[in-house]
């Protein structure tokens, strides 16, 4: 086995091929140099039964890192029905050398390549001039050569990664023309065949026109991750994070073609996707435009993979407008697409009243309907309130136009609590409030419970709900019960969701357990002198108490007597290990008056007013500024943002300012933090129980009303109830719920059972929502407003709902999602000892600290605000012949009469 090579030894000892010398000799002697292969092997036509892995490759190599067992065929992870046939280039009788690619700019100067083989469909032999050839470098990277264009790509960072992903990172496959069956096999349900937008992907003006006509159309993006892409244009967007961004995008000849995010993302939390004049695809994030794909088809098939994997490795990735991103920026992009990257603002944009032309001058708005949708019942539902106008009689200047289409109107219903959550009968102003509160929990818009409306405010909202005048008052209890059941389930019983109290209770219980274990190790690390000062009895007693506490973790952190015990232990340890004037005074005060002594400041937690004023623990050696800062953070959100911020930076939440030996300081710091975390857990538990009482009282009150109403309907025989066996059975179930509402810790299950019965009541199920929908559409399309901005929920919903018109957000029912994840509000669940969150437990088991005791600054993890896009439903536009235009006329036949609006 040999082939013609000319090798020189470089100073670094690397063996390289001098291609220029080889070509010179070939020219001199006019001799064709061809590879010579003395090894004959027969390619197998059968389907390979062996999967490619590192061991298979190692066994195929002989001396000198050359394939000594050519012809072995293995399956690879992707594409489907592809195999890898091992062998050197010369085994396949091709005029190439592996060493010729050592000069690639993808490799460092001291890297060299070794052969692996050709990747090809399993039903045929490799085609040396068509199929990609795979190699690996001396540093572990896996390289693929496109034998058609001779371009080289890095497709994996290691052989193990190549084993797991196959040729997913091979760019030519993302642009391949595939038949529908093969397209589905390779890339799932993405639409990249002969669809119109794929045919227009190299025609920017035509693409703009397509996007304008198909605004809101949603397609799946990326066969390997859960993304979706929704078409929308620049005229559909009100703002992108910072001011002036939209103008800069248009000045640079970029066009917004849509938004993208992982599924289950709110429309306003999506990333803007931009097409450049070169028809490449870019993403706008963090005030920068970065290229993610060379075509729309590649983007839909591979999503953001090229950007995240750093396509700069590719030799043909040349573009002056490309911004390479760092590892940190890549991580930020991942976090943004997952809805985790906070956008820091003094006030969220969706809470600000818009200065929009739609609001300023509604009398000059035109409503545009495509001619092919003019006869649609959905469109007629709105145009009956409008008067058609003739385009020829209008001035030639641009007018402010609001598109009206079936897709928009259908999507827009998801901006109501009636359509999205099944909560019927509310007046649109109250519907907006309920929808706004529930949508925050459905999309987990924020991460701290303190940001959400708590139970006492929900109780006030329930009492003040406004209903439509044609909705029977006696069935209002079903609507209220639905709101209570959904909000209580999302805020109290869903421990898997970060915004809930139960999640943070679990999180801090795991943290406290870890700190107790660490404290036990700190006791063992004390010097003999420190141990003598502490006293053997105290040390042994606390060690045994530690074991008892950890064995009974299911309730110990919630007991106030346990908190007082460790607080007194903290004071004793400071007295024994420090003994300064401050420590002695605190020790004497505690021994004289015990728990009656006011050791710390009292604060009222702003977000949890129902528990009243609480006493802070007796912390020592914090320093006045640090102590004041800590008190303000506790008053703001119970210190949750500070705790998470410190943990993210591998620091303990509290650090001490004390002059003692390092072993003593470490012990006292850990004990101080244990006291603080147990205090927070104890307070959270009080809040949970207080909210549980509020929701339980609301539930029993409304379910009692529902039972009485159903019984009255049965006696009076209304709506066919008298002879309806299903209704009679439902009424019996409702009576049983009233008689036995169940334990308070899991009343939500009974609440949802009552809700199921309530939703099936004929009078509620068949309620005519026509008037409600009319008011909703007329308001948000700016035809006839039923309220102006006067409440934070109304402002927020007015700003958020346009995104639901434009982006199709038909998702799984929120109640069904909650039913799969709720847990009882019981101590063993709250401490993560039952139905364990393994990820959380694993995180704290490996948590390390680095110099946490020396950091006096406090790191705050900011509240999440990822609503980066604001949408609008109209813009300045030139009038077109393929649209029919309408305007609002107060005296038109379809004018609303008698609606209980407050315009």
Swiss-Prot record:
<keyword id="KW-1043">Host membrane</keyword>
<dbReference type="GO" id="GO:0016020">
    <property type="term" value="C:membrane"/>
</dbReference>
<dbReference type="Pfam" id="PF05999">
    <property type="entry name" value="Herpes_U5"/>
</dbReference>
<comment type="similarity">
    <text>Belongs to the herpesviridae US22 family.</text>
</comment>
<dbReference type="GO" id="GO:0033644">
    <property type="term" value="C:host cell membrane"/>
</dbReference>
<protein>
    <recommendedName>
        <fullName>Protein U7</fullName>
    </recommendedName>
</protein>
<dbReference type="InterPro" id="IPR010302">
    <property type="entry name" value="UL27-like_protein_herpesevirus"/>
</dbReference>
<keyword id="KW-0812">Transmembrane</keyword>
<keyword id="KW-1133">Transmembrane helix</keyword>
<feature type="transmembrane region" description="Helical">
    <location>
        <begin position="665"/>
        <end position="685"/>
    </location>
</feature>
<keyword id="KW-0472">Membrane</keyword>
